[in-house]
């Protein structure tokens, strides 16, 4: 995709910087952050994050600062228009999904409903 406006999910600079720092210590330069959605949590769906060095057929890869974010097609349909960010604060540090498709979220922010 050459036009940034066509990318359906934003991978923020803060998230890319954190991913880059986390994978620098690993012995695998092909690692990327994978964000996915599963059923569960108190609101019906929950976000998950893992490091992955495989890109499956149909996966979307978004690059920022020479690191990648991977999203599978099933999860992407729930994340269109959203963003993956990284925050640090008094309540700790974590990757955060801002999802405009979520009709409600739980107090912890890791589960949502559509």
Swiss-Prot record:
Binding-site residues, iron-sulfur cluster: 42, 106, 108
PROSITE patterns, A to Z: HESB (PS01152)
Cited InterPro entries: FeS_biogenesis, FeS_cluster_insertion, FeS_cluster_insertion_CS, FeS_cluster_insertion_RrpA, HesB-like_dom_sf
Cofactor note: Binds 1 iron-sulfur cluster per subunit.
Cellular component GO terms, alphabetical: cytosol
SUPFAM superfamilies in UniProt: HesB-like domain
Function comment: Required for insertion of 4Fe-4S clusters for at least IspG.
Subunit structure: Homodimer.
Name of protein: Iron-sulfur cluster insertion protein ErpA
Gene: erpA
């Amino acid at each position: 995709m050459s036009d940034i406006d066509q990318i359906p999910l934003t991978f923020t600079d803060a998230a890319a910087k954190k991913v880059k720092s986390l994978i620098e210590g690993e012995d695998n330069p092909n690692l990327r952050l994978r964000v996915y959605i599963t059923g569960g949590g108190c609101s019906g769906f929950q976000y998950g994050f893992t490091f992955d060095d495989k890109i499956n057929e149909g996966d979307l890869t978004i690059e920022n600062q020479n690191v990648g974010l991977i999203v599978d097609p099933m999860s992407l349909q729930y994340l269109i228009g959203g963003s993956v960010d990284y925050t640090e604060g008094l309540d700790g540090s974590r990757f955060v999904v801002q999802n405009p498709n979520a009709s409600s979220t739980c107090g912890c922010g890791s589960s949502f409903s559509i």
